[in-house]
Amino acid sequence: MYAKNTWEKYKDQLNEVFDYNEGYKHYISKNKTERACVKDSIKLAEEKGFKPLESFDTLKSGDKVYVTNRGKNIALFIIGKKPLTEGMRILGAHIDSPRMDLKQNPLYESEGFTLADTHYYGGIKKYQWVTIPLSLYGVVCKKDGTVVDVVIGEDENDPVVGISDLLIHLSADQLDKKAAKVIEGENLDVTLGNMPLFGEEKDAVKANVLKLLKEKYDIEEENFVSAEIEVVPSGKARDYGLDRSMVAGYGHDDRVCAYTSLTAILDSDVSEYTSCAILVDKEEIGSVGATGAHSLFFENTVAELLLKMGIDSFVQTRLTMSRSKMLSSDVSAGVDPLFVNVNDKKNAAYLGNGIVFNKYTGSRGKSGSNDASAEYVAQVRAVMDNANIHYQTAELGRVDQGGGGTIAYILGNYNMDVIDAGIAVLNMHAPMEIVSKVDVYETYQAYKAFLKDA
């Protein structure tokens, strides 16, 4: 009863759908790390009149504010007409995606090649990440405080790197292995070069790679100890399908919900309640650490907002959180016509049918789930129906088939109402994921409606 084809809704407004997705394609094509997402989000926010919190002495209704954390989180606010202590309307997405990270001592030479040791980040099917073009993104931090940005493999004139695989002719033993073991995690090593530094006798190929890095970035091998270099798929997001109805790209999980959340608040006016969009890191590995959703960053930021309103109270900070309502902006598993047996089809998400609401996620008995209350689900339904938003409800696959989690339960621990709401994705956690353009646009509209009317 909730599955409505959303293309029909926009059949006379296709230009709006496609134009919005051009902006999204540009965003994910240039922002393949959490640091890049934050940097670009600041730029977009400032163009819309948002200012850093430290530039305000006091805050009033209508003020547009942003706060960042270690270059990996950003929280944006439009101060509402009602007192902040009456709660916020929050959109929360994550901007980290599955990938591989260079180890702290990554470089070595073997059989005439220079390679870089990696440790994969998040849940991946390791065999999907070999024999494809890869890029290197990140920062190298030197002892003197200098931070060097590194991007190799994205400019059309750049070289790319990659991970090799065994030729089919010699794969008899490999093909007998289970899929989880076909490519071992310790063998996800990136090939960086094959040419020696002429005149060098020991590790000459490695020496040549280090020479090139020194020339371009002025970095030494020891600097990798204090570096964060991420290995990600190369290339831009592309239209997918002969009808151009979908977007193929890296990092839809969860940058598609990050972008729609970001643009929803940037395109919103002042509402009754304070609007908020927060983009966090580390969701793919448990939302841990100083930049994950478990961090006190968000709570501290709310306390600082209240302080600039003349309220210095731990109790009021906690009550503000408790009185808030949130959409955990995260993707859902779309039904794949080639793998329909993993879904309960009447409780599944379909590409082209609008935003997806997951009352609960988790796995095997709802373990680790937020499980939104029926009362809150009804409130969200009313907001969506009043705004003529196409939405669907889903679970993450059949019972006991697997499962997954989001940041919903973390904010729910503050006693606020939270429900997962996002976009159906195919190929989730693969180097190339797929979303429907009309779902992207409808989710943007849904997020705006939530900020305005929830």
Which residues does each PLM region occupy?
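N-terminal hydrophobic/helix-forming segments and targeting peptides
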Residues: M1-A454
